[in-house]
């Protein structure tokens, strides 16, 4: 059981890194050099929303990257628009610019292509549904475990 548990944890990490590689290769194919794969996923997680940096951090999983630094970079390169929050002038909100929305559309097209290829290999993607159930169960376990510690 211990070996299966450890293998699952390592596989989750490898899959995340592999997906970042997939995103990076798409950015390279599109000759986009002013943004990296993690920043692209930050944009994807923002989507059509307007968020504070704190909300963005809570929504995504960026493997310890500095979300504030990445947001500054994305604003400087025209992917995000940053505005003061109307209710609290100390807080800022970010939303995608037209350039950011265009990149998110390109990433969504990549994801659609991936889904199509996966569906050809295993029609219905039922194996992913089962995998997701297992991952949600593991996430709940770790969340409950951490809440018991504090």
Predicted regions and their residues:
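C-terminal regulatory/oligomerization modules of transcriptional regulators
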Residues: 1, 125-150
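N-terminal positioning helix adjacent to the helix-turn-helix/winged-helix DNA-binding module
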Residues: 4, 37-39, 99, 127
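Short amphipathic alpha-helical segments with heptad-repeat character
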Residues: 6-9, 13, 17, 61, ...
